[in-house]
Amino acid sequence: MTFSILVCVVSLFVLLWMLRRDRLSLGLPIAYLGSLLLIHLPGAFAHAVTGERLQGNEYVATGILFTAIGCVCFVAGVWLAHATLRPPATPGIADRRAFAYFCLVGGWTFVYGLSPLNRLTSVGAVIETGGAIWMLGTMLGLRAAVHANNLQRAVIWGAALAVYPTLMLLIGGFLSYGAAAVMVVLSILTIYARTYMRAVVGIAVASFIGLTFFVNYFDHRDDIRQSVWGGASMGDRVGSITGMLDEFHLVSLDNDKDLTALDVRLNQNTFVGLAASRLDQGQVDFLNGQSVIDGVISVIPRAIWPDKPTSAGSGQTVAEMTGLQLNTDTSWGVGNVMEFYINFGIPGLVGGFLGLGWLIGMLDLRAAAAERRGDFRTLIVCFLPAVALIDPNGSIVEISGGAAAALMAGFGWRWGWGMWKSRELAAAQNRAARFPQPGPGPAI
């Protein structure tokens, strides 16, 4: 188990080193691999360090081994994308500040202003994935502020980043969605940190802070959700969240509650190991590509195919493959590691992560090159589908359907940015016509 954990960690830092060589990246592969390790590594580490204090070590060992294989293959896929593709990346002059604010305001409008439309068939998926454009604006704004050592602007963009996870906690009672968004936005800083070691230290510190916040949240999760889901006033909801501060503590493997939190919610390895064991014993059968076929079908909008036989959610798959009775009040994702394995075994694991690494690496590379050129229309179209793919705890159906919806949203935002720039240019030309530049005056 220890060796598998080391392989996972080394894979992350090899990927970081690789992406920092030419810095032609927005950090999206880092965001994916970091998100994958977040739901596998803490639980495996807790089992490795505490020995027999936690049950199911044999399942965890299998799960983290498969995760390590997936990490290596994912990094190889990203490397393959960088080795075979070289989009033009000549630096161009563009109004990056205006674009960042356009993305931020537009994204918030989608997320909060158009949220009632999320229930509409197909339209809801486009609005949900298209709203992620606020992450792009925050990412670029925060990078510029940090690069310029402008503390005031960094604080402003940091506050903008905090809006989404805070509201997700207050309105939905969930921490995971906000944490995923924060990871996507902050990953760009690992690429543009002044030194490699500074990026490594930053990842380590952020991981410790994140796990500390998680275990404190987990201790109070039931109270928070009871308040939020019970329709309590906003003041009471804030009070249930700030109540964490009364018993706030640093994450510790000597704390049984912390161990339980890491084992229960940040340990997909148990599910992977259970599924692998049941497959080996013949208690369940391999899916033989059925969920991959479902993923292809999910790309077709339900507005076109109302009776489409696929739907989001993978709790039933997890229950069937592991034999567990799962709590219906909690979301259970099959995860990329388990789903790739339960389809084709180890070959599915290798091929799945190679392909996913290449796809995210390709989109990230093209997005970064477009940003460097000042081609924001291409940047949007590449960024949104890449973010939709960063869902290591989701199913192939959710990922492929989300990426397709994000691509449609990307083309919509591409058009919107083009229209906004055209109107801005027309307004500038109109002002110039009304107040022409005076010519040279007579010599004095």
Enumerate the predicted regions with their spans.
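Long extracytoplasmic/lumenal interhelical loops at the membrane interface
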Residues: 122, 283-347
